[in-house]
Design a protein with these regions (language model features):
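Leucine-rich solenoid repeat scaffolds
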Residues: 622-691
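Short glycine/acidic-rich loop motifs that flank beta-strands on beta-rich extracellular proteins
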Residues: 338-341, 353-354, 358-364, 389-396, ...
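Secretory targeting and sorting signals
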Residues: 2-10, 15-17, 23-77
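Acidic Gly/Asp/Thr-rich repetitive segments characteristic of extracellular carbohydrate-active
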Residues: 298-330
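Right-handed parallel beta-helix
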Residues: 352-355, 377-388, 407-418, 429-445, ...
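Extracellular beta-strand-rich solenoid/capping regions of secreted or surface-exposed proteins
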Residues: 316, 320-321, 336-350, 358-383, ...
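Extracellular beta-strand-rich, repetitive "passenger/adhesive" scaffolds
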Residues: 143-145, 304, 326-335, 351-357, ...
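Extracytoplasmic
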Residues: 75, 80-291
């Protein structure tokens, strides 16, 4: 346990702190006036007198936002500590994902593994159900008076609770309390909400559970018809296609608790929520706030850490001052109301840590300049939270956490919550590094590299509950090149894919962990769609683990693969595509799919795809589903628990006497199988037609060590 800190300004009475901050803000007016008048000399080697003044006051102003946290103090160890609730990663035994996914500071514990008086829901992977959107596809349902209790696996002073509440009858959500106790005492209350959950209907979705179909002229699988063209008109049950059911909330516990201490989450009697579903608990040791002493402290420029007044202009003033004096901007602990974009260029902004510094509001975002205006360079954002207020999907709205064009920039250790997209970059731009961020509860994507993003890295990010692709590269009109997604974790995207690559050159997707995609997508996706430029150079998909993917595609009424290649706009045949060292675990349908769409089935092909050193642990149907013309090679692809024929080869659905239009090349070492024998049997090669659109689905066993 680290030593307790000496008493800081945070320990003073609130009135004394308020007086100190008032003095600081008053002095800041003088500092800003001097800076504007040009009376502060610029020095490269050392800060100016005004900058030193700001630095000296930074520490004294630090305490305001930390008042609620209290000092860290561990309780004495229990004489007989309880066995800890199992720690998982994406609801997996961590050994099955070792070396893959984001390296995070928290321990994940699933509610279904905890002690509870509630009811287990799931397992179920059927879209539009509460279990389907839960991590591991199970959760615990509580009614008032019931609880779920977790035993801490390690010291912790902070928790994150992932939960679901009912919607209001007419939409818009409700709020309800959740009591948190540690070792049966120290009760705190969280106010949960479903105001950011519950979308319905067809794209781009609605918040109204009683809304009629948004697109009655679209074919829907529920009636296997186009409702507007069907007589008699089908009766469509309401609410239609409920989704995006979960949210999460964080809580500082006020002190450090030890491994073996118990965290109990109780729905109090009289709760307005008929039920509360708890999916999981993340626990961690946050520690003390970060202090940036030699910085332009935003408090000194009028920023309000209580969140009552808008701080956007004050932050702009701090940025302008910092750029003139070659200083970073520091956002001390607190909540800062910002209801527009903060435009950043050539500036470093750091907070006290994402648990202590929050920038919150309608339309809040940190944006680089538009690429057409030259874009921004040298932007460095770190150690704060961005809390948006986005409740509906409007694709033209620029309400993303981070946006614009930012070359030679870094985005590190942010927590981005309730924005439309966590980070959406519109290039051309180059050399941005996005690392160690937590991106949750987004209406659309977690991150998107859109249009001409090059030489950039996304690493060690944790993404959960997005409403579209978790991480995406979209090479629309101008190609992306030499970008890498490495060691990220993506869990429970409610629509589309965990990681999606739409065109581009020399791309790497490596050592990621992707779990529980829900519908109209899967874990890993390579697609020539949405007007993307062709794949060229190389595409390397290496050392990733997926679990509980290979989802049902409701528009096609078939199952996808954990990794799926989709040729729609053009061929996928110019790049050298290497899919190497991946593990596809507990696949609902297939492990691998290569597919086109019916209107273009005789116009497009997929070629130059090579699968090597792959492990497939359980498929509901096949290892490979081929529904396109082309070819692929396979080497050392080992499979077990295969639920149907190993290769479901439909080709382009012309069924010529010469065999399928898709061929599989055997490079040796393809072992294992399942219900029909060896998955890569000689009789299937190179292009035997084995097409079965809807074979019986055999639920695979839980993944286990190979």
């Amino acid at each position: 346990m680290p030593p307790r800190r000496a008493a800081s300004p945070a320990a003073r009475a609130p009135e004394a702190v308020a007086e100190a901050v008032a003095e600081v803000v008053a002095d800041a007016e003088v500092v800003v006036a001097v800076a504007v008048a040009g009376g502060v000399a610029r020095r490269r080697a050392a800060p100016t007198r005004a900058a030193a003044f700001l630095a000296a006051l930074t520490v004294s102003a630090l305490g305001l936002g930390a008042l609620g946290a209290g000092p860290a103090a561990a309780r004495p160890a229990a004489s007989d500590p309880a066995a800890p609730t199992a720690v998982t990663r994406a609801a997996l035994d961590p050994a099955l994902a070792e070396g893959r996914g984001a390296r995070v500071d928290f321990a994940e514990q699933e509610a279904e593994n905890a002690v509870t008086t509630g009811t287990l829901i799931g397992p179920d992977r059927t879209a539009y159900s509460l279990p389907a959107e839960a991590s591991g596809r199970k959760a615990v349902r509580l009614v008032p008076g019931q609880y779920v209790e977790f035993t801490l696996p390690a010291a912790a002073d902070a928790i994150t609770v992932r939960y679901s509440l009912p919607d209001a009858p007419a939409g818009g959500g409700i709020t309800a309390p959740l009591d948190v106790t540690v070792n049966g005492k120290n009760r705190r209350s969280m106010t949960l909400t479903s105001q950011y959950s519950w979308l319905y209907n067809q794209y781009p979705f609605s918040n109204d559970p009683q809304a009629d179909l948004l697109h009655p002229d679209w074919w829907i699988t529920e009636c296997a018809c186009v409702p507007a063209a069907t007589t008699p008109a089908p009766v469509i049950a309401k609410p239609f296609r409920p989704t995006h059911m979960y949210d999460e909330q964080r809580l500082l516990l006020g002190r450090t608790y030890r491994a073996g201490d118990t965290i109990r989450l109780t729905v109090p009697a009289g709760s307005p929520a008929a039920w509360t579903v708890i999916d999981l608990l993340d626990s961690q040791r946050v520690g003390a706030p970060h202090v940036e002493a030699a910085a332009a402290n935003a408090l000194l420029f009028g920023a309000d850490p209580t969140g009552r007044r808008d701080s956007a202009d004050a932050i702009d003033r701090a940025i302008a001052f910092a750029k003139r004096h070659r200083l970073p901007v520091y956002l001390p602990p607190g909540t800062y109301q910002v209801n527009r974009h903060i435009i950043v260029d050539g500036v470093t902004i750091t907070g006290a840590g994402s648990w202590y510094t929050t920038v919150k509001g309608k339309g809040v975002g940190f944006y680089g300049k538009e690429a057409a205006d030259g874009g921004s360079r040298g932007v460095h954002l770190s150690r704060f939270a961005i809390e948006g207020d986005v409740r509906e999907r409007v694709d033209t709205d620029q309400v993303n956490g981070v946006g614009g064009a930012m070359s030679d920039s870094t985005i590190d250790s942010l927590h981005i919550h309730h924005t439309k997209v966590g980070l959406w970059f519109d290039g051309p731009m180059s050399n941005v590094k996005v690392t160690r961020n937590v991106i949750t509860d987004q209406i659309a994507d977690g991150l998107n590299f859109h249009t001409g993003v090059t030489d950039s890295l996304v690493q060690d990010n944790f993404v959960r509950n997005t409403g579209d692709d978790g991480l995406a590269m979209w090479a629309e009109k101008t190609t992306n090149a030499r970008n890498t997604f490495d060691h990220n974790t993506v869990q429970s995207p409610t629509l589309a894919n965990g990681i999606a690559i739409y065109g581009g050159a020399d791309t790497t997707v490596s050592a990621n962990l992707v779990a529980d995609p829900v519908r109209e997508g899967s874990a890993l996706h390579v697609g020539s769609r949405f007007g993307a430029e062709p794949f060229t150079g190389s595409l390397r998909v290496e050392g990733n683990t997926t679990v509980r993917s290979g989802t049902y595609e409701l528009n096609w009424n078939i199952g996808l693969g954990a990794i799926w290649f989709y040729a729609l706009d053009r061929n996928i045949d110019q790049a050298d595509i290497q899919v190497t060292g991946n593990s596809f675990l507990d696949n609902t349908y297939n492990a691998i799919m290569l597919v086109s769409d019916w209107p273009v089935k005789d116009k497009v092909r997929i070629e130059n795809v090579h699968f090597k050193d792959i492990r497939v642990d359980g498929t509901g149907t096949s290892v490979v589903s081929a529904r396109v013309a082309g070819s692929a090679s396979f080497e050392n692809v080992d499979a077990r628990g295969v639920g149907a024929v190993g290769v479901n080869n439909c080709g382009s659905f012309n069924f010529p006497a010469t065999g399928s239009e898709f061929s599989l090349a055997d490079r040796g070492g393809n072992d294992g199988g399942g219900t029909t024998g060896p998955w890569f049997a000689g009789w299937e090669l190179p292009n035997t037609i084995t097409c079965d659109d809807r074979p019986p689905v055999v639920a695979p066993p839980a993944p286990s060590p190979w």
